[in-house]
From Swiss-Prot:
The lineage of its organism: Eukaryota, Fungi, Dikarya, Ascomycota, Taphrinomycotina. Keywords: Acyltransferase, Metal-binding, Mitochondrion, Transferase, Transit peptide, tRNA processing. Binds 1 divalent metal cation per subunit. Residues 1-78 form a transit peptide. Pfam families: TsaD. Substrate binds at residues 179-183, 212, 228, 232, 328-329, 363. GO terms for biological process: mitochondrial tRNA threonylcarbamoyladenosine modification. Required for the formation of a threonylcarbamoyl group on adenosine at position 37 (t(6)A37) in mitochondrial tRNAs that read codons beginning with adenine. Probably involved in the transfer of the threonylcarbamoyl moiety of threonylcarbamoyl-AMP (TC-AMP) to the N6 group of A37. Involved in mitochondrial genome maintenance. It comes from Schizosaccharomyces pombe (strain 972 / ATCC 24843) (Fission yeast). Homodimer. GO terms for cellular component: mitochondrion. This is tRNA N6-adenosine threonylcarbamoyltransferase, mitochondrial. The keyword Transit peptide applies. HAMAP family: TsaD. It catalyses: L-threonylcarbamoyladenylate + adenosine(37) in tRNA = N(6)-L-threonylcarbamoyladenosine(37) in tRNA + AMP + H(+).
Length: 412
């Protein structure tokens, strides 16, 4: 049904200029913005290998805002890349092209069974991420927005991770955000929807990339999981008499570098590769080494987080939020919780709470894209139809890229 509507409208309007479409769409946005307290988004996320589509609804009242994930469908293809040791850039595009329409169809059907047959906006990830996969999702979203005459919201992927916790929990700004994934490792002070100050970021590779490579070096089967998740399942803290030498050094832990405002994981990766290639390891030693490789990386993250917390005005910070795919790791959660206990003991009494999204919302997903799009729409922003995917896009520069429009059709 959606395809029929899309084709019909698109055929009628194919001669209409982009300018006319934008003017019509802006009028429709203003009308919707003024009259609706409930907003529903159809959202698409294709920044890496997962093909994810969701319908998200927010309902505002005078006292609170209720958020609801009507449906979320994510097609995972990670098993196809184990033979390549990572995401294959050509195959991943083909998989998105093959699967996206089917996932959209399933999501729309699921939403219809919940009584939702119309959407107020079309949301999609614009970046940062892999250009090919992003383009598949972005072009599909543009077609849906034009065909259904709905506003387009092209969302910042890491902004969505930073806001993901608000989708499920009543958490207000400001809060400190640890964003840990395959492409990013950042400590961010999230002050508002658009104000995200980078406190610490990685100087080389991301922690998720590091963990994925460690799993590859150790030859751990992925079992339809991300390599980092397979590493977590494989690891064991149990030690024997031959394992003491398998404890990697904590990065940037010297007197000269311990206070530096950066993460670094490339040295740990080189250490892991060197030990595994030169040292024969039995199964128990591999399991212990896998645990220690995680521990060293997470201890590094915790040290920098503790340093940042000591420097911040803690009277304004109520939450330490951990988001992104690596935030699913149970060892990381435990170590961050221990870090807050150290802060209480060393620094000052504080009621900062460690919170994180549910596992499915930690990983790449369209629900967080839909929620973020709705918040941007409420703030008066939409996206033009000529927006292009962005590979690198700092979270503290959300509005600096071309393609944002205000309610009066003015470019930002």
């Amino acid at each position: 049904m959606l395809c029929l509507v899309y084709n019909s409208i698109l055929c009628k309007q194919r001669r209409i200029s982009l300018k006319v479409l934008q003017q019509f769409r802006c009028w429709n946005i203003s009308k919707t913005f003024l009259s609706y307290r409930t907003l529903t988004a159809l959202a698409i996320e294709t920044s890496c290998d997962d093909t994810s589509v969701s319908v998200v609804r927010t309902s505002d009242s005078s006292s609170h805002c209720q958020n609801e994930i009507i449906c979320l469908n994510t097609h995972r293809t990670i098993s196809k890349y184990e033979a390549y040791g990572g995401i294959h850039p050509t195959i991943v595009i083909h998989e998105h092209q093959k699967n996206l329409a089917k996932v959209i169809q399933r999501t729309i059907s699921d939403a219809a069974r919940s009584g939702i047959t119309d959407f107020d906006l079309i949301a999609v990830t614009r970046g940062p991420g892999m250009i090919g996969p992003l383009a598949v999702g972005l072009n599909t979203a543009k077609g849906l927005a034009v065909g259904l005459q709905k506003p387009l919201l092209a969302v910042h992927h890491m902004q969505a991770h930073a806001l993901a916790v608000q989708l499920e929990k009543s958490i207000d700004f400001p809060y400190l955000n640890i964003l840990v994934s395959g492409g990013h490792t950042m400590l961010v002070y999230s002050n508002s929807l658009l104000n995200h100050e980078i406190i610490v970021t990685t100087s080389d590779i991301a922690v998720g990339d590091y963990l994925d490579k460690c799993a590859k070096y150790l030859g751990i089967p992925w079992d339809n999981e991300m390599p980092a998740a397979a590493l977590e399942q494989f690891a064991s803290p149990e030690i024997n008499s031959t394992s003491y030498s398998l404890k990697p050094p904590i990065p940037l832990n010297t007197r000269e570098k311990v206070h530096s405002a950066s993460f670094s994981f490339s040295g740990l990766e080189s250490y892991a590769c060197r030990i595994i290639r030169k040292t024969p390891l039995n199964l128990s030693e591999k399991k212990f080494f896998a645990y220690q490789l995680q521990y060293a990386a997470f201890q590094h993250i915790c040290q920098k987080t503790l340093l940042a917390l000591k420097r911040l005005d803690l009277s304004k910070v109520k939450y330490l939020v951990c988001s992104g795919g690596v935030a699913r790791n149970e060892l990381l959660k435990k170590m961050l919780n221990d870090t807050l206990m150290v802060l209480q003991f060393e620094h000052q009494p504080t009621d900062i709470k460690l919170v994180y999204p549910s596992p499915d919302i930690c990983s790449d997903n369209a629900a967080m894209i839909g929620y973020t799009a709705i918040q941007m729409f409420k703030a008066g922003y939409t996206s033009s139809f000529d927006v292009e995917p962005i590979r690198k896009w700092p979270i503290n520069q959300i509005l600096t890229v071309e393609g944002w429009l205000t309610k009066k059709n003015k470019k930002v």
